[in-house]
Amino acid sequence: MNFSGKYQVQTQENYEAFMKAVGMPDDIIQKGKDIKGVSEIVQNGKHFKFIITAGSKVIQNEFTLGEECEMEFMTGEKIKAVVQQEGDNKLVTTFKGIKSVTEFNGDTVTSTMTKGDVVFKRVSKRI
């Protein structure tokens, strides 16, 4: 399955609780909670580029499945992680006590991030 495309956020659950759990300042949480960000994914074999635009903030991360890479987290912090593919439609990684699962189903992408007992879920649709 090729994951390339542009996707816009439709819904999110537990945004504020998750952002607090990962140390995001309250003023940034308030600014970001209603933004319907756009993610552009470019896949070339096992190599991926994610460009995430939320308001004026743009985060660009590149990785190759199964290889350690450095990525920018939503807090602006640089992290090291290894992204794996599970089955035909899931990208999974764990970093700093956070498990991230991105699942592709047709024109819908569901991203779930879990830290402790706080689960943040974001659903995006292809545009």
From Swiss-Prot:
This is Fatty acid-binding protein, liver. The modification Deamidated asparagine is found at residue 105. Plays a role in lipoprotein-mediated cholesterol uptake in hepatocytes. Binds cholesterol. Binds free fatty acids and their coenzyme A derivatives, bilirubin, and some other small molecules in the cytoplasm. May be involved in intracellular lipid transport. GO terms for cellular component: cytosol; nucleoplasm; nucleus. Deamidation and transpeptidation at the beta carboxyl of Asn-105 forms an isoaspartyl residue and Edman degradation appears as though blocked. This rearrangement gives rise to an extra negative charge carried by the acid form. The modification N6-succinyllysine is found at residues 31, 36, 46, 57, 78, 90, 121. The modification Phosphoserine is found at residues 39, 56, 100. It comes from Bos taurus. Monomer. GO terms for molecular function: antioxidant activity; chromatin binding; fatty acid binding.
